[in-house]
Amino acid sequence: MKNIVFMGTPDYASVILEAILKNGGYNVVAVFTQPDRPVGRKAILTPPEVKKTVLQSGLDIPIFQPLNLKDSSTVNDIKALKPNFIVVAAYGQILPKDILDIAPCINLHASLLPKFRGASPIQEAILRGELLSGVTAMRMGVGLDDGDILGFSVIEIPNLKSSQLFCELAKMAAKLTIKILNEFESISPIAQFHALSSKCGKVHKEDGLIDIKLQTPKIIESKFRAYYPWPGLYLENGVKIWDMEISNLKGENGYVLSIDYDGFTIGVNGGSIKIKSLQESGKKMVNAKDYINGKRLGVGSKFC
């Protein structure tokens, strides 16, 4: 039975880890994940999803949460585990060469490489209006997501939110992981075409801010899907939009153009959007009709 060291942090990685644990053909000798972080207004110390998965499994798998993989003690810990493979999925740290040299390191990246190397490939694919996305399994090198390709899976992504695409790609990545592990010795890796590469950085809260005077309905709708549920889509007045769609009405930016049973429409640059649910800062989410009634807004009223 092959020994695996698994490295990952969010839900996406948990789905992959669960598939390896259920497969029965591999022995997960250790899991590396990010440290517990304070979450929410009360700053409750919360473990990452991968750690939760290990604890809930009831299996006696050592969990490591180092701040830095470059520490010599961490490298020695991994060497002592004698892994046949190191499987990496959205871990959150770059692996140093000392670890890459221990065993084949296989990364499951949530894009069709060489497109969208980096921290936010799912969000970036939606923002760019891509029709296809997918998962790429690669043999990791010292560069950022630039290793040789071992295999990939593809999915059509029109109209998907990032949360939905995360779920779909996680399931695809789980199946691809088992396939690559089973067939690793017979796979001929393919070098990436680096001239076609693109990069994407971490998503920040301010990325969800929209300017209705400058951004078109299509751009706003793409940002809504890309940043759902976090950081979300919000206006300069602090209102967060939880559900929306593009409208075909025309009118003045920021003003209410129409009201119906499931929302209200406001003018934006080059068109309009229909808001169906929203949330004021410090308050609960409400449906748009209740918001309009509570604020006593009507057609022609200024919303933002």
From Swiss-Prot:
Function summary: Attaches a formyl group to the free amino group of methionyl-tRNA(fMet). The formyl group appears to play a dual role in the initiator identity of N-formylmethionyl-tRNA by promoting its recognition by IF2 and preventing the misappropriation of this tRNA by the elongation apparatus.
SUPFAM superfamilies documented for this protein: FMT C-terminal domain-like, Formyltransferase
Reactions catalysed, as given in the entry: L-methionyl-tRNA(fMet) + (6R)-10-formyltetrahydrofolate = N-formyl-L-methionyl-tRNA(fMet) + (6S)-5,6,7,8-tetrahydrofolate + H(+)
Gene: fmt
Family: Belongs to the Fmt family.
Gene Ontology MF terms in the entry: methionyl-tRNA formyltransferase activity
Origin: domain of life: Bacteria
Enzyme Commission identifier(s): 2.1.2.9
Alphabetic keyword roster: Protein biosynthesis, Transferase
Designated name of the protein: Methionyl-tRNA formyltransferase
Annotated Gene Ontology cellular component terms: cytosol
NCBIfam families tied to this protein: fmt (TIGR00460)
Record-linked PANTHER family: METHIONYL-TRNA FORMYLTRANSFERASE (PTHR11138), METHIONYL-TRNA FORMYLTRANSFERASE, MITOCHONDRIAL (PTHR11138:SF5)
Residue numbers binding (6S)-5,6,7,8-tetrahydrofolate: S111, L112, L113, P114
